[in-house]
Curated annotation (Swiss-Prot):
Source species: Burkholderia cenocepacia (strain ATCC BAA-245 / DSM 16553 / LMG 16656 / NCTC 13227 / J2315 / CF5610)
Pfam families, A to Z: YgbB
Role: Involved in the biosynthesis of isopentenyl diphosphate (IPP) and dimethylallyl diphosphate (DMAPP), two major building blocks of isoprenoid compounds. Catalyzes the conversion of 4-diphosphocytidyl-2-C-methyl-D-erythritol 2-phosphate (CDP-ME2P) to 2-C-methyl-D-erythritol 2,4-cyclodiphosphate (ME-CPP) with a corresponding release of cytidine 5-monophosphate (CMP).
GO molecular function ontology, one term from the record: 2-C-methyl-D-erythritol 2,4-cyclodiphosphate synthase activity
HAMAP family, sorted: IspF
UniProt cofactor note: Binds 1 divalent metal cation per subunit.
Alphabetically ordered keywords of this record: Isoprene biosynthesis, Lyase, Metal-binding
Protein's UniProt name: 2-C-methyl-D-erythritol 2,4-cyclodiphosphate synthase
Length: 161
């Protein structure tokens, strides 16, 4: 079997006046993530991991932050489009593992919803999608609550490989 592993990363600044959307879940908080789209840091990291595993570039190549068509875009729509492109390139998505690093708010109550959204968007059973939440132990810009970061890994299998 031809296995492919991809790694994804994203970070966005926290600002007032924007909703906080992570993993397709709107989380009650006084600030949200700044970005061209809905700035869903988790879905962007997963999208990058999938594109990377398939050697299809990155999220910016497919959904440019300078393209008005993606202004305010729902990152779940982008993730579904990514999955379609990965499948069209002859790959099957096996699993996704991810970590969100945020000093606040607490994300644990929202992880089940995030996992369900990601599994649905990728057409995977829930047990093949994992989301972890960590703080940065008050260190650096993440620890000061200036932004939220996400990291992801994805495993693909090339069909006929």
């Amino acid at each position: 079997m031809d296995f492919r592993i991809g790694q994804g990363y994203d970070v966005h600044q926290l600002v007032e006046g924007r909703p906080l959307i992570i993993g397709g879940v709107t989380i009650p908080y006084e600030r949200g993530l700044l970005g061209h789209s809905d700035a869903d840091v988790l879905l962007h990291a997963i999208t990058d991991a999938l594109f990377g595993a398939a050697a299809l570039g990155d999220i910016g190549r497919h959904f440019s932050d300078t393209d008005a068509a993606f202004k305010g875009a729902d990152s779940r729509v982008l993730l579904r489009a990514c999955a379609e492109r990965v499948k069209a390139a002859g790959f099957t998505i096996q699993n996704v593992d991810s970590t969100v690093i945020a000093q606040a708010p607490k994300l644990a109550p929202h992880i089940d919803g995030m996992r369900a959204n990601i599994a649905a968007d990728l057409g995977l059973p829930l047990e093949r999608v994992n989301v972890k939440a960590k703080t940065n132990e008050k260190l650096g810009y993440l620890g000061r609550g200036e932004g939220i970061e996400a990291q992801a890994a994805a495993l693909l299998v090339k069909q006929g490989g």
